[in-house]
Design a protein with these regions (language model features):
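N-terminal low-complexity, intrinsically disordered segments
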Residues: 57-81
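Core alpha/beta structural scaffold of self-assembling particle/tube/pore-forming proteins
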Residues: 2-58, 84-373
Length: 373
């Protein structure tokens, strides 16, 4: 019996909608997919428009005052509002099947489902790796309109030769080797309130723990009770720490040395391990991110330098945003006159990362980056 192209399209479309669990294993590249989880879970935001925009008040002008009876007033209006502007980044993948593959498996339910699911899973895996890779790096340059704004774009290291902790993270180190201070449309070089907290460390010891304590304390801003909090806090635990394997190992070793009994408590007093062995710092989980294993920057002399960074991210203020109606959109199976026996499904989406408050979004602690000799 002849099977028409339209029947094959319908078969592919209806099967793809409700694939059962596959009977094959995948050799994953990454141990964790933190960015992907944020994009797929309740922490993501949904937005529309030609770009992602938010307003932010960066400073005040000291107009409040105590007054005496019958004092005169001098009302003024100050322009302290700035606009955060983040472009959309488009991402996509595709998966294809030849008519002969489909025909050879159409009488075997298991074979047909494995054919469809394995092809889709391989491409979804590729998509996840790309999202994760770019989520832990800055774009190629200040004019790069292809890649999203990864975590290092918003949470910057101290400048070369700087070691004093504070809200001094202002220089974006782009993947292509250039630098800049304009972050999401606002110049951190001119606006000191549009900078993140950064500090340096030498060894993994009590001095580093003190540095972490101070960073946590200084980035936890609480508004006065009579001022409405404009943040977008969501459910669940929004704060996590991230590091590469070398630093995670050293922090776990430090935790073991601090508590021989290995009883479940906090690293600032005793060790607290979760099921996969990562420690907690001030009740904040420390997660291993394989992309940070190979993170390097250029020092003052232009040489590659490994900062071995510890990132802390508050996902209430550094938000993953997807475009309304255009995220993980799967097309109908399509054919092309140049490959008339091939059916292709396209998966597309539009997203980026948005930081609404760089002072509250987290911090980074890294090895001092050498200045130019």
């Amino acid at each position: 019996m002849k099977v028409t192209a339209s029947q094959l399209v319908d078969l592919l479309a209806t099967t793809l909608e409700d694939l059962p669990k596959g009977q094959f294993e995948v050799m994953w590249d990454s141990q964790n997919y933190k960015i992907c989880r944020i994009l797929q879970e309740h922490r993501r935001q949904i937005d529309g428009g030609t770009s992602i925009q938010r307003n932010v008040i960066l400073d005040r002008n000291g107009r409040a005052r105590y007054r005496r009876l019958f004092d005169t007033d001098s009302p003024t209006v100050d322009q302290n509002m700035k606009t955060i502007d983040v472009p959309w980044a488009q991402i996509g993948t595709d998966y294809s099947w030849d008519v002969l593959e489909i025909m050879r498996n159409r009488n075997s339910e298991k074979g047909f489902i494995n054919l469809l699911e394995s092809r889709r899973t391989e491409r979804m895996w590729d998509l996840a790796e790309l999202i994760e890779e770019r989520g832990w790096s800055a774009p190629e340059s200040a004019t790069d309109s292809l890649y999203p704004y990864g975590i290092p774009y918003y949470i910057n290291f101290l400048n070369d030769g700087e070691t004093e902790a504070g809200f001094s993270g202002r220089t974006i180190r782009y993947s292509g080797g250039t630098t800049g201070t304009i972050c999401a449309g606002i110049d951190a070089g001119a606006e000191d309130k549009w900078r993140n907290y950064a500090a340096t460390r030498t060894n993994v010891d009590n001095a580093m723990l003190r540095t972490i304590r101070q960073a946590i304390r200084r980035t936890r801003f609480r508004p006065p009770p009579f001022v409405q909090n404009p943040g977008q806090d969501g459910p669940g635990t929004p704060i996590e720490m991230y590091a590469g394997d070398v630093l995670v190992n050293e922090l776990e070793d430090l935790a073991d040395r601090r508590d021989d009994n290995n009883t479940p408590d906090d690293l600032m007093g005793k060790v607290l391990h979760n099921y996969d062995g990562a420690v907690y710092i001030n009740r904040i989980p420390l997660c291993y991110v394989p992309q940070l294993d190979t993170q390097t920057v250029l020092d003052g002399d232009g040489n590659e330098f490994s900062p071995e960074a510890l990132y802390c991210v508050d996902w209430s203020y550094l938000q993953a945003v997807v475009q309304d109606g255009y995220w993980m959109e799967e097309s109908e199976p399509q054919t092309d006159r140049g490959q008339h026996t091939t059916f292709t499904v396209f998966l597309d989406g539009s997203h980026n990362n948005l930081c609404i408050n760089r002072r509250r979004a987290g911090f980074v602690i890294h090895k001092p980056i050498p200045a130019a000799a």
